[in-house]
Each structure stands twice: as structure tokens, then as C-alpha cells.
């Protein structure tokens, strides 16, 4: 077909120009049939809707818009999460700071003693370590240097990681199979001390020196090397660069949580006085006082199931006051009736989650005393039976213990229910022993009981309980 043929278009008369406009900025060889994609020039009209070019150019823009929106939402959620985390951390820090203030509005006398201890530490009158025992415990002093309390930090307990006594460390290293007491919750001794004081106050026994959970910091406590280095670094920063040092929440050593028990004066180990009373018998009235105080110790130890009660960790105060108010011209003095009181200390190994059933039975050593063979008196029955026979009283006691025990960072609700089940069983046995006019010796020979809350699929306003007896005995049984 020649160029003059009517089938040839006039536009095709000239050879096609495959070069791009100079404004495009692209230079490609003029090859017929070459496919290239050219960016639209500024001011050029949009592609017709529905054309392939239009879809290809619009799709990335939509994807970018959606991606930007999703990224914005993610950043918003992350910012909200960070804000919530910051609020939670601030709330936790505020709660911790509130606890560390050691405020006891329900017991202003106890709070005043704690303030004296804090003031003494500020004046560099530090607590003094007690070298007896298997844990880190300290005599706390007032600004005048007098002993006012005994402090037992949580992390310095017999099985704590900062226990300064090497005996437990050696036992753990050489005999791990016999390390610890599997019937107890480890590192909860400070709560056990405070719990025993709570039970004592609820039952109005008045034999446990008031004990509560307190936070204290002292140079004489056993801290890790890291804590001491951090404390020295913060103090140095505060001295050298005050603007930086003032930003720290705490400058000194971190406070330790532990049990703070008021110190009792004039008491000696029960073993000392019991041996003396055996050699020098007491008058009848004085011996009666000792028996009534002894019964209170039995009630307390049995309810909390104290696994560490010997005759060397409860105290007796024997006071024989002399009345010298008579005339100085005479040599006569009037001797008043002696006064005997008992103090139950060292209650850190109580509230087990099961009755001892492995190697040792952890008996009550007071069960071998002659006072344990005497039936319970009417005075102790009148004091205790109305309380422990009332389900509402027992329930209130459980709730108070729950509020105390849940303060521990490692609190486990399941373990607490097991502890309460053991305590209910002890209360059940004690109630029956008091009603049957039994003696403390007969009480400890009763079979161990566990009273658990019955599980029911139906909701009920009242709780039901299941009672079970423990048949397994420890390898080294004492009865």
C-alpha cells in the first residue's frame, strides 16, 4: 500500500516521533514498541475514571492513607497504655509511700513508739542485731538508747535470701532435703508474728506484746552490696550535684518490711522460772495465777498451730512487790501478793497450710509440763468459749487475718484458704475440749482436723463446711 492510498491516515503520513517532551526530564532511546511509564506532568489532566492508569495511581494513595490512619491509632493506643502504666506506677509508688509512713490511727500508742524508733535512727542510734536465733532480728532503741521493740525484717527470716546467720545457709547447702518446713508458707514469718498479735487481741488473751507490720531502714540491717552502692552513689550525687540528687525518690537505703513487736521488760525465759518454781514451790494463789496465764498460752498456740514453741521462747515475769510506805521509824514492811504474767513471743512459725505430716511433728513442748495435766479452768472457758463458738466471730477473725496477710507481695489466696482451714480445725477441737472439761495434754492428743469451705454450684447466703481428719502422721511422731 503506498502513501497516497486513502486507507492511510493523514496523521500517519509523517513518521512517528518517539521522543519525550523536554520538560519530562527523561531521555530514552526512540525505539518503536518500547513501553515506559511516564509521571504525569504538572498541570496535566487526570486520567479518565475507570482507566487502568487511574486505578494504579490511586491505589497506593489509599493504602498510604489507611496505613497512616492505622499507625496513628497504634500510636494513640500506645500513648494511652503508657499513660495508664505511668498512672499505675504512680499509684503503686504512692501506696508504697503511704505504707512506709507507718501510720496506725487505730493504735496511737503503738504509732508513737514507732516514731521514737524512726527518730532514733535519724540520730544515728541504730537497731542492734540479736545474735541468738536463726534469723536476722534487731533490738530497736529510742533516742535515749533504751530498747523499745524487736524488729524482724522479712528478707532476713530463717529462709530469707538476706539472712545474716550462716547456719540456715549451711543447712540449705548441705541438706536441702531437710531445708525448711513444708507445712509453712516460706518468708511469711513477719505476718505470722503480726497475726498472732491480732488473734491475741481478738480473744482478749493479752499475752502477746503488740506486733504490727512496719517499714524501717537502718545501716545495721543486712543489705545487699548493690543497695549499699546505690545508696552511697545517691548521697554523693546529692552532695556534688544537688539538682540531680533532688530528683531521686529516696536517698538512703530502702526500708525493709518486717514485724515490729513492743519490748517487754522484767521477763525471763520460762525455762528459768519453771526450774526455780520446781525447786521452790509457789504459794497456792500465785500458782493459780501461773496456771491461768499458762492456759492462755495454750489457747493461743493451739489456735495458730505454733510449730516452734519451746520453753525458751515464751517468757514469765515474777514480781514480788514490797510495800515500804510504812513509817521510816519502823523496820516493818508489808509484802504484797506476787504477780505472775506470761508473754508469748517468737510466733513467726505459725499458721501452717497443713498439719505437720512429713519428718517432724513440731510438738508443743509445754505439753510435758505438770500444768498441762490440769483440766481447763472455768475462767478460761468463760473467756474463750463464747467467742470461738460464735460463727460470726470466727468469720470476722478470718477476714481480719485476710486483710493482714494480703499485704505480702507474694500473697496466694489458695494458700491462705488452706491456712484458715487448719485454724478452723484447731478451733473446733479446742471448743470440744473446753466443753468436755479436758486438759491441755488431752487437747494436743486429739486427731488433727481440717475444716474447709464446701464448694457449691448454687449461691447461698450462708457458707457450708466440710470436715476431714488427717490420718498421715510425721515420721518422728511424739504420741
Swiss-Prot record:
Chain positions found as Phosphoserine: 5, 9, 44, 47, 51, 462
Subcellular localization: Golgi apparatus, trans-Golgi network membrane; Membrane raft; Cell projection, Dendrite; Presynaptic cell membrane
Catalytic function, reaction form: a 1,2-diacyl-sn-glycero-3-phospho-(1D-myo-inositol) + ATP = a 1,2-diacyl-sn-glycero-3-phospho-(1D-myo-inositol 4-phosphate) + ADP + H(+)
Location of the region described as Important for substrate binding in the Swiss-Prot/TrEMBL record: 157-159
Impact when changing residue 172 to A: Abolishes enzyme activity
Tissue expression per record: Widely expressed. Highest expression is observed in kidney, brain, heart, skeletal muscle, and placenta and lowest expression is observed in colon, thymus, and small intestine.
PANTHER family linked to this entry: PHOSPHATIDYLINOSITOL 4-KINASE TYPE 2-ALPHA, PHOSPHATIDYLINOSITOL 4-KINASE TYPE-II
Positions of the UniProt region annotated as Activation loop: 344-364
Effect of substituting residue 184 to A: Abolishes enzyme activity
Residues annotated to bind ATP: 131-137, 152, 261-264, 346
Family recorded in the similarity comment: Belongs to the PI3/PI4-kinase family. Type II PI4K subfamily.
Outcome of swapping residue 275 to E: Reduces enzyme activity, probably due to impaired membrane-association
Mutagenesis / variant outcome for changing residue 163 to A: Reduces enzyme activity
Effect annotated for changing residue 349 to A: Abolishes enzyme activity
Residues with PTM N-acetylmethionine: 1
Organism listed in the record: Homo sapiens
GO CC annotation, single: growing cell tip
GO terms for MF: 1-phosphatidylinositol 4-kinase activity; AP-3 adaptor complex binding; ATP binding; magnesium ion binding
Region (Disordered): 1-74
Protein name according to UniProt: Phosphatidylinositol 4-kinase type 2-alpha
Region called Important for interaction with membranes, residue ranges: 165-178, 268-276, 359-368
Illness association: Neurodevelopmental disorder with hyperkinetic movements, seizures, and structural brain abnormalities: An autosomal recessive disorder characterized by failure to thrive, global developmental delay with intellectual disability and absent speech, seizures, hypotonia, inability to walk, orofacial dyskinesia, involuntary movements, and structural brain abnormalities.
Subunit relationships: Associates with the BLOC-1 and the AP-3 complexes; the BLOC-1 complex is required for optimal binding of PI4K2A to the AP-3 complex. Interacts with BLOC1S5 and DTNBP1. Interacts with FOS; this interaction may enhance phosphatidylinositol phosphorylation activity. Interacts with ITCH. Interacts with ATG9A.
